[in-house]
């Protein structure tokens, strides 16, 4: 019996893009879904959660989720006690996370609390950013920061296609010591595949906000059959970008849009697959 599994990451509140990915998943008859985090950090956090739930229920698909940065921030306790409360960058993140929380239901937040930090599935390690960051978190913990605030003050580089050779060697060696031969990750919004000595890494890219110069949402299809190894393919889907632009225009209170230039840069990011910083006029 052949089983189709969908893996996706980094929706970033872009419900029109997510709907296009879900339509493609339905066409492929996926019956299991792994979501690797960053669902909520965008203009339609509740809408994206609702779409995922409804699609999986309608298609009788099992859904398993990991926390991304957005979910980690949301679940940070006692945010009013965070260090560096008065620093501008922190004020902005605190207010942005509060906006997400205000636009989620109690049931949404309870569900997010069930998300995993990382997951092992068959011969694979599933993470949001990097298996080293998830399985060796003590390596990046900052001194004088309370344990509950460590994730708030850490933003992984993730796994990028242009990493230096020594970074790749460290990652392959880590996979050897941990006895897994396959990694699925997200975080960088750049979909790609890398193989070395029987080990494979798939970055799922982003299902809502790509950063590889291609605005089409990305996801990964895994086909499992008894007679062959896992068949793994990165897929891209078309969607009407005007729909997310309209949603942005209908959400003027989104905290990041306090700067009108950022709002336009954000739209241009989603239209081009090029980071919003490249579109700012200042």
Give the residues covered by each predicted segment.
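Acidic, His/Gly-rich catalytic cores of divalent-metal-dependent hydrolytic chemistry
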Residues: 182, 194-282
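Active-site neighborhood of divalent metal-dependent phosphoester bond hydrolases
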Residues: 54-121, 158-174, 179
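Beta-strand-turn-beta hairpins that frame and shape the catalytic cleft
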Residues: 1-6, 119-125, 196-200, 230-231
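Internal, conserved structured core segments that host functional sites
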Residues: 110-160
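N-terminal active-site segment of His-dependent metallophosphoesterases
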Residues: 1-55
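Active-site neighborhood of phospho(di)ester-bond hydrolases with catalytic His/Asp-centered motifs
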Residues: 8-9, 33-38, 64-69, 127, ...
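A contiguous binding-surface segment within folded domains or other stable secondary-structure elements
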Residues: 156-211
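Active-site environment of divalent metal-dependent phosphoester hydrolases
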Residues: 12-17, 41-44, 70-75, 119-120, ...
């Amino acid at each position: 019996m052949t089983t189709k599994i969908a893996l996706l990451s980094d929706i970033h509140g872009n419900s029109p893009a997510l709907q296009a990915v879900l339509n493609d998943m339905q066409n492929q008859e996926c019956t299991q879904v792994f979501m690797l985090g960053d669902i909520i950090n965008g203009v339609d956090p509740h809408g994206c959660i609702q779409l995922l739930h409804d699609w999986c229920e309608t298609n009788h698909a099992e859904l398993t989720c990991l926390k991304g940065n957005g979910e980690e921030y949301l679940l940070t306790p006692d945010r009013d006690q965070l260090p560096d409360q008065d620093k501008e960058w922190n004020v902005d993140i605190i207010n942005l996370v509060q906006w997400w929380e205000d636009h989620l239901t109690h049931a949404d937040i309870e569900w997010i609390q069930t998300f995993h930090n990382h997951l092992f599935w068959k011969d694979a390690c599933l993470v949001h950013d990097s298996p080293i960051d998830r399985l060796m978190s003590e390596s990046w913990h900052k001194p004088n920061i309370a344990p509950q605030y460590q994730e708030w003050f850490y933003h992984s580089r993730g796994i990028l296609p242009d990493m230096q050779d020594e970074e790749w060697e460290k990652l392959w060696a880590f996979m050897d010591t941990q006895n897994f031969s396959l990694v699925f990750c997200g975080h960088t919004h750049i979909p790609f595949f890398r193989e070395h000595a029987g080990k494979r890494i798939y970055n799922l890219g982003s299902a809502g906000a790509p950063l590889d110069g291609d605005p089409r949402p990305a996801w990964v299809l895994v086909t499992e059959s008894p007679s062959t190894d896992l068949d793994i393919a990165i897929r891209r889907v078309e969607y009407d970008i005007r729909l997310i632009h309209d949603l942005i225009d209908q959400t003027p209170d989104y905290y990041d849009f306090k700067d009108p230039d950022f709002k336009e840069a954000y739209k241009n990011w989603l239209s081009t697959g090029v980071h919003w910083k490249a579109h700012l006029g200042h």
